[in-house]
Amino acid sequence: MTSEQVDAFVQALHVAASNSTKPLVRSTLYTISATPEDAFEHSILSWKAQEYAYRQFSRDSAELPTLARGLFTEVVCENGKEHARIVARGYDKFFNMGELPWTSREAIGRYSQGPYTLSYKENGCIIFVAALSPVRLVITSKHAIGARPDAPVSHSDMGRTWLLRHLEQQNLNEVDLAAELWHRNETAVLELCDDSFEEHVLPYSAERTGLHLHGLNANTIDFKTRPMDEVNAFAEHWGFIPVRYKVFDTIEDVDAFAKKVAKTGSVDGEPVEGFVVRTTMPFTLDVEEGIVPPPYKPGQTWFYKIKFDEPYLMYRNWRELTRTMLRAKRI
């Protein structure tokens, strides 16, 4: 990936954001002040797409140039010339099995190959950690940086609080992690699970409260992420909570395991929301008429998810009903 390719990609985002009165993608500017360690002020753009837009995505789309869900860019000066840089990158938006034509069981069976890695779907909120410079990190939520006017503590601020706790436990610091992520040119993708900060449907014990590391994404235009064994090794070294996962050789093995778990909505007695399935496109892509392929290149990693209706959906429905009743009572 060249600087010119990144420039063209970010320019395509700007064009898409200004295309119509109701663009599919918008940007928000965040300014991060200079520090004694990092002498430059950073102007970071967060790119956010309309949720429905992901369903309309095609590789040649001008209205939505990427499936990335969570994307931060800035302009930097290299050798006297300004270039765009991808600061942090989330996963490509992924969908439930059967939710789109290219996540039908038939499409998955034809356009994926083993091994299939099923990571437990954690029940929190996304935090990105990336390097602003070799000595400085930026911690974001899915689309925002820093404080929020409508909340005493923002997701990104709580993410920073937990990040420093994890690093301190390992006798490491922010500069150490910044140097590593800068060298890798990667974004650490974590799940903030802290019921005292934000309660979700499934509760977390004290030992599983904090930042769960479930991805290391390359800061590239095309989606690229490290395998789970490398992600967990990184988590162990830096003090994050490793994500649980299982590996299967065939899609039939995945189907059998998912069917078994769906009967109870739990694994070893523990309720689970579902699994994120990580697979790759076949290296030789033979498109069959009537079976829509995912919008990925041969050999590229792509995700889909398996979610269970019970007990997770039941818990969520009761929660929403309770909130509705409480709001009505206040009125």
Language model feature labels by segment:
Residues 1-331:
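Core nucleotide-handling region used for phosphoryl-transfer chemistry
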